[in-house]
Amino acid sequence: MSEKQAHTRVIQGKVISQAGNKSIVILVERKVVHSKYRKIVKRFKKYTIHDENQSAKIGDVVSAIECKPISKTKAFRFKEIITAGVEL
């Protein structure tokens, strides 16, 4: 059982919105090498994360762990706040 849990993905991104009750949307940035031009380019993807305690705020940098699908769009759970964002 522990071997199976070792393969779960952990993603890290910035909270950009609160998508309802117990849900947040994070923006994950990754850098890839362009196949033709060999330049490093940024790629962005939004993930909907399940936040049970509603502890993450907009602007926080958080990590999330992969889990079984919770809903149509949610397949990650909130893990921890890495850096607290600035409140305006």
From Swiss-Prot:
Gene3D superfamilies: Nucleic acid-binding proteins (2.40.50.140). One of its GO terms (biological process) is translation. GO terms for cellular component: cytosolic small ribosomal subunit. GO terms for molecular function: rRNA binding; structural constituent of ribosome. Keywords: Ribonucleoprotein, Ribosomal protein, RNA-binding, rRNA-binding. SUPFAM superfamilies: Nucleic acid-binding proteins. InterPro entries: NA-bd_OB-fold, Ribosomal_uS17, Ribosomal_uS17_bact/chlr, Ribosomal_uS17_CS. Part of the 30S ribosomal subunit. One of the primary rRNA binding proteins, it binds specifically to the 5'-end of 16S ribosomal RNA. Belongs to the universal ribosomal protein uS17 family. PANTHER family: 40S RIBOSOMAL PROTEIN S11 FAMILY MEMBER, SMALL RIBOSOMAL SUBUNIT PROTEIN US17M. This is Small ribosomal subunit protein uS17. It comes from Helicobacter hepaticus (strain ATCC 51449 / 3B1).
